[in-house]
Amino acid sequence: MDFGDDLELVGAEITVKEINYVSELTGLTFPDDTEPVGYYFLGSGIDRSLVLKVMIQGDQREEFLKNEIFEKGNDAKSNHHIAKQQEWWKVNELTERIDRKFELPKLKYVECTVGLEEGKTFVYVTWFEI
C-alpha cells in the first residue's frame, strides 16, 4: 500500500497477500491456516498504520508465541485509535490475554495481542509509524 490509500477488508476479502504484507511489515509469522477476520490499512494520514485480526488454531498458539515480539517486546496493551474504530476489534473481550509492543527500525512499532474469544484463539495486530 502506498501513501494516500486506505483499505478495509473483512473475512474472506482478506487474502494471503494482506497476511504476507503484515508479516513483511511486522516480522510476525502466521500459521498457514490462519483465518482472517478484519484488516484495515490507513495510508491517507501523515503516518501509515494498519490493524489486523485473525483466528489461529488453538494448538498453534504456543508456536505463534515464539515470534520475536513475545520474546523481546514490552508488556503493553494496544490502544491505537484506528483499531478502536473497527467493529470487529474486540480485544477487550479476550481472556487468557498476552499483550506485547515492540519497536522496529525507523520509528515504526508493532503491537500484538493473543487471547481467547468465545473459546477460540485470536490474534490482534497493530502496526504504525511516527
Language-model features, listed with the residues they occupy:
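N-terminal leader/targeting segments
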Residues: M1-L42
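Extracytoplasmic electrostatic interaction patches
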Residues: E68-I130
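Residues that act as N-cap/strand-start positions at coil-to-secondary-structure junctions
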Residues: V22, R48, K106-K108
